[in-house]
Curated annotation (Swiss-Prot):
Signal peptide: none annotated. This is Transcription elongation factor GreA. It comes from the Bacteria. Necessary for efficient RNA polymerase transcription elongation past template-encoded arresting sites. The arresting sites in DNA have the property of trapping a certain fraction of elongating RNA polymerases that pass through, resulting in locked ternary complexes. Cleavage of the nascent transcript by cleavage factors such as GreA or GreB allows the resumption of elongation from the new 3'terminus. GreA releases sequences of 2 to 3 nucleotides.
């Protein structure tokens, strides 16, 4: 069975946009760069040609990856999410039990994660610790800097 990749609608749209750009804009640009470099003659010492071929390889690899991700995407409609228990898509407000520092994270798909923007991957240690918990619960997360304890202050959706 094919493993589904959970993501938000916004994350899915971003993947589709990148796929379209790589197929319809980047691919033709690289093909043109290869043709132009090939016209310069000897390919064995043609740095432009080798750079363009490397760019082509990278682009085609990413296209394959994006096609796979979009085919396996399980788009979760966050507008239909609710409840007290934390699951994919939840926005969770936490307080560090040692420093009293408050943080808010939204649990999103791996491709959408951006810690600086407050979006953490569903497969991250903190998200895994949060899943199934609710307001008032405490969690302990083994982070690179050691173990951290958080209390869940708020769970919201959308």
């Amino acid at each position: 069975m094919v493993e589904k990749v959970p993501m938000t609608q916004g994350g899915f749209v971003k993947l589709q946009e990148e796929l379209r750009w790589r197929q319809q804009e980047e691919r033709p640009r690289i093909i043109e760069a290869i043709a132009e470099a090939r016209a310069h003659g000897d390919l064995s010492e043609n740095a432009e040609y080798h750079a363009a071929k490397e760019a082509q390889s990278h682009n085609e690899g990413r296209i394959t990856e994006l096609e796979d991700l979009t085919a396996r995407a399980e788009v979760i409609d966050l507008t239909k999410m609710s409840g007290d228990k934390i699951k994919f898509g939840a926005k969770v407000k936490l307080v560090d039990e040692d420093t009293e520092e408050e943080k808010t994270y939204q649990i999103v798909g791996d491709q959408e994660a951006d810690v600086k923007a407050g979006r953490i991957s569903i497969s991250s240690p903190i998200a895994r610790a949060l899943i199934g918990k609710e307001v008032g619960d405490s969690i302990e997360v083994n982070a690179p800097g050691g173990s951290k304890a958080y209390e869940i202050l708020q769970v919201s959706w959308g």
